[in-house]
């Protein structure tokens, strides 16, 4: 299945990253004991660890992250655990999209799955986005009948109202807030646009910048979410001027 293939590719990426970390730490340990020569690469890695920064060789083998080393390591372990649980227990009720190396690949896999089931071209499908009325993915009882439940996003530059079920102005001093789980529902591209929504760009990291991929899009950009605005005076344009975006991870 497309999701099975995607999982296999993600596991390969994580295994490679873990191997790089393991082998480099073993080599650094030997260098500190004086068993091997401390190379410039090892010295750079040692200094990075000393100052709570992600070593360059780990970053090169890893995923985009702005976190300091301690938080980055905790985040990586959570990602590995999510992958292990998926492997052992089958499809989760909700997918932690920010936990993937290549979240764009997960989105494509959902399109491919729907395309195969309904025997339709993949370019005739888009998503409707349905934020859930609760904040925890643990409250999702069973997988989505169509598409998938996805969780783990943060809103940058605005807040989320669970009462009004839409984006609202941030509270003073509150820069980023968690978004509820969202149901990604595949529909035909000819389906009408979701009313009273803001086309909110989703980025992997807070830099909102990356290198251009072969598709002409930034490698940091995942997709655009349609988030309810609640109507009234706060239209999508209002949130565009605010520079509101969704993020897959925080910087701390």
Please report, for each region that a protein language model flagged, where it lies by residue.
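Long C-terminal appendages of very large multidomain proteins
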Residues: 1-252
């Amino acid at each position: 299945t497309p999701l099975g293939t995607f999982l296999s590719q993600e596991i390969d990426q994580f295994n490679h990253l873990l191997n790089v970390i393991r082998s480099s730490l073993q080599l650094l340990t030997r260098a500190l004991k004086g068993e091997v020569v401390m190379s410039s690469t090892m010295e750079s890695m040692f200094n990075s660890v000393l100052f709570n920064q992600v070593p360059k060789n780990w970053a090169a083998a890893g995923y985009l992250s702005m976190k300091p080393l301690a938080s980055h390591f905790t985040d990586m372990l959570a990602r590995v655990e999510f992958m292990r649980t998926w492997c052992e227990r089958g499809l989760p009720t909700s997918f932690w999209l920010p936990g993937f190396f290549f979240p764009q690949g997960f989105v494509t896999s959902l399109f491919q799955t729907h395309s195969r089931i309904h025997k339709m071209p993949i370019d005739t499908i888009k998503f409707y986005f349905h934020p859930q009325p609760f904040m925890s993915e643990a409250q999702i009882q069973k997988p989505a009948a169509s598409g998938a439940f996805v969780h783990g996003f943060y809103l940058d530059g605005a807040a989320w109202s669970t009462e009004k079920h839409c984006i609202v102005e941030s509270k003073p001093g509150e820069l980023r807030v968690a978004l509820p789980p969202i149901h990604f529902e595949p529909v035909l591209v000819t389906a009408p646009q979701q009313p009273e929504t803001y086309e909110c760009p989703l980025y992997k990291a807070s830099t909102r910048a990356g290198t251009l991929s072969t598709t002409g899009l930034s490698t940091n950009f995942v997709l655009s979410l349609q988030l309810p605005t609640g109507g009234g005076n706060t239209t999508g344009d209002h949130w565009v001027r605010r520079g509101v975006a969704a993020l897959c991870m925080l910087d701390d």
